[in-house]
């Protein structure tokens, strides 16, 4: 099932307020696994003609790769027609690749929400470093694809490593969608974090994952305004002021979480404007 048709209807009604990123046709993994890139490229082109503005790849999330089972490594030759298509058309790609590094343990060091959320991965899941390697292979072959890596590419604890990627591949961007661990990690070294965000202010985009729980819910449910506001408050508290506050489990967005100290770093107005909206234009 997909929410793309509903999203395209919203875009048709409010064309200046909605942008739609299609997902893949998951049935192609089972029908044409050995030619997956060719058939997904055709599907993405059709969705582009329907009015989609980009592609969202969720298959880089380890749980998705395990559930699907039939997803080839992203650097395998069968994907090449898709990567070539995306590079030739400059069709943007928002990619959820990997998950927080703490998901790979050890369990005793993992945050409470990872442990209680059953998000600890064993060797039956794809390894995060293996996926980073696959992505590096793709970037070397197709450096001009417009990639946006969600959740700071899950490198909020490795900003120098992320900086090297941004320096090497000028078309790569990242977004700041929570994952709580992003905000925990950035609060640990606000001087380094502020320097990174000011330097790469042209390469960072706003994101929230607002509405994700509605889409993933087994039964239809309305958008939770309190959760939406909690997500935005978490982001704003990091970037807009020299925040110094203890964030506790609130039952809205912060669920099963450890208490943590959030330290903000008061980004410049120029950087905020770019991150919040200008970089999406």
Q: Where are the model-predicted features located?
A:
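Active-site gating/metal-coordination segments in enzymes
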Residues: 3-119, 124, 173, 178-180
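Distinct, well-ordered alpha-helical segments
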Residues: 3-11, 32-44, 104-110, 128-140, ...
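Helix C-cap/helix->beta junction micro-motif
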Residues: 14, 88-89, 142-143, 168-169, ...
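Short, surface-exposed connector motifs at secondary-structure boundaries
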Residues: 120, 141-148
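H/E-rich (His + Asp/Glu) clusters that bind or coordinate divalent metals
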Residues: 130-137, 146-281
């Amino acid at each position: 099932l997909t929410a793309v048709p509903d999203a395209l209807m919203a875009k048709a009604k409010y064309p200046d307020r909605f942008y739609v990123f299609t997902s893949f046709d998951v049935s192609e993994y089972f029908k044409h696994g050995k030619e997956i890139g060719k058939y997904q490229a055709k599907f993405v082109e059709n969705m582009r003609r329907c009015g989609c503005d980009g592609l969202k790849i969720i298959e880089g999330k380890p749980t998705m790769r395990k559930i699907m089972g039939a997803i080839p490594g992203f650097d395998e030759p069968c994907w090449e027609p898709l990567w070539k298509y995306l590079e030739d058309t400059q069709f943007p790609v928002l990619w959820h690749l990997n998950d927080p590094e703490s998901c790979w343990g050890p369990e005793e060091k993992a945050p409470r929400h990872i442990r209680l959320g059953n998000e600890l991965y064993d060797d039956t899941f794809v390894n995060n470093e293996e996926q980073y390697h696959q992505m590096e292979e793709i970037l070397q072959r197709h450096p001009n694809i417009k990639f946006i890596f969600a959740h700071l590419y899950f490198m909020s604890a490795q900003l120098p490593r992320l900086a090297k990627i941004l320096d090497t591949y000028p078309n790569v961007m990242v977004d700041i969608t929570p994952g709580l661990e992003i905000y925990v990690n950035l609060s640990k070294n606000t001087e380094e974090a502020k320097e990174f965000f000011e330097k790469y202010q042209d390469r960072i985009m706003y994101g929230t994952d607002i509405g994700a729980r509605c889409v993933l819910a087994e039964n239809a449910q309305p958008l939770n305004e309190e959760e939406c506001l909690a997500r935005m408050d978490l982001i704003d508290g990091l970037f807009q002021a020299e925040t110094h506050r203890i964030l506790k489990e609130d039952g809205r967005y912060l669920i099963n979480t450890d208490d943590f100290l959030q330290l903000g770093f008061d980004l410049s107005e120029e950087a905020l404007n770019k991150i919040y909206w200008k970089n999406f234009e």
